[in-house]
Amino acid sequence: MAADISESSGADCNGDPRNSAKLDADYPLRVLYCGVCSLPTEYCEYMPDVAKCRQWLEKNFPNEFAKLTVENSPKQEAGISEGQGTAGEEEEKKKQKRGGRGQIKQKKKTVPQKVTIAKIPRAKKKYVTRVCGLATFEIDLKEAQRFFAQKFSCGASVTGEDEIIIQGDFTDDIIDVIQEKWPEVVDDSIEDLGEVKK
């Protein structure tokens, strides 16, 4: 009678099925890791570059790829039969699932590479110099801000997404200083706007 009870359930003595071992699995388990994302192949679908992972799996392990596509096909058929169609699938791809890194955004270089320098009046006879566009040349704005503050012995701060404000009128010297420090910024790409109101 006791033997019947122990054989009938795969659970432990407390009745917890989580601690029971899989009966059809051979131990130690052999796990197949993806060559693209270095995770087990079951987790590739949660990575942002799923297409690359699937291509790698199809090329190197076609048997596993066939198993994976067979497992995923009932889910896709159920979604289409409910009337969602391809619009629902695209909407699902846009939303980030819980966990994971989300989609990796590609940098777009549509902004022209141009540095603009302007002198802005502050109070009475005081001015600040505004430098915009250094980020289009892949220049770290924090590093540039520290460099300007040290070079001109004044206060400098990063105020906008691509804007550095230097306390003082340095429009004459700053063009030469920028070209000395960052040679990739050529003379044609620097524009002096002169005195501009805030």
Swiss-Prot record:
Residues 1-20, 72-110 are annotated as: Disordered. The modification N-acetylalanine is found at A2. InterPro entries: DENR/SUI1_TIF (IPR050318), DENR_C (IPR046447), DENR_eukaryotes (IPR005873), DENR_N (IPR048517), SUI1 (IPR001950), SUI1_dom_sf (IPR036877). The keyword Iron does not apply. Residues 115-182 form the SUI1 domain. GO terms for cellular component: cytoplasm. Its main location: cytoplasm. Residues 1-11 have a biased composition (Polar residues). Residues 95-110 have a biased composition (Basic residues). The modification Phosphoserine is found at S20, S73, S189. GO terms for biological process: formation of translation preinitiation complex; translation reinitiation. It is found in: Cytoplasm. Keywords: Acetylation, Cytoplasm, Initiation factor, Phosphoprotein, Protein biosynthesis. The modification Phosphothreonine is found at T86. CDD domains: DENR_C (cd11607). It comes from the Eukaryota. It holds the Pfam family SUI1. Transmembrane segments: none annotated. One of its GO terms (molecular function) is translation initiation factor activity. Belongs to the DENR family. Interacts with MCTS1 (via PUA domain); the complex regulates translation reinitiation. Translation regulator forming a complex with MCTS1 to promote translation reinitiation. Translation reinitiation is the process where the small ribosomal subunit remains attached to the mRNA following termination of translation of a regulatory upstream ORF (uORF), and resume scanning on the same mRNA molecule to initiate translation of a downstream ORF, usually the main ORF (mORF). The MCTS1/DENR complex is pivotal to two linked mechanisms essential for translation reinitiation. This is Density-regulated protein. It comes from Pongo abelii. The lineage of its organism: Eukaryota, Metazoa, Chordata, Craniata, Vertebrata.
